[in-house]
Amino acid sequence: XXEEQFDDYGHMRF
């Protein structure tokens, strides 16, 4: 991914 996002568990996803 490009922007920093958080999944339903609060983990950072890129």
From Swiss-Prot:
The keyword Secreted applies. The keyword GTP-binding does not apply. GO terms for biological process: neuropeptide signaling pathway. The modification Sulfotyrosine is found at residue 9. Coiled coil: none annotated. It comes from the Eukaryota. The modification Phenylalanine amide is found at residue 14. Keywords: Amidation, Neuropeptide, Secreted, Sulfation. Belongs to the gastrin/cholecystokinin family. This is Neosulfakinin-2.
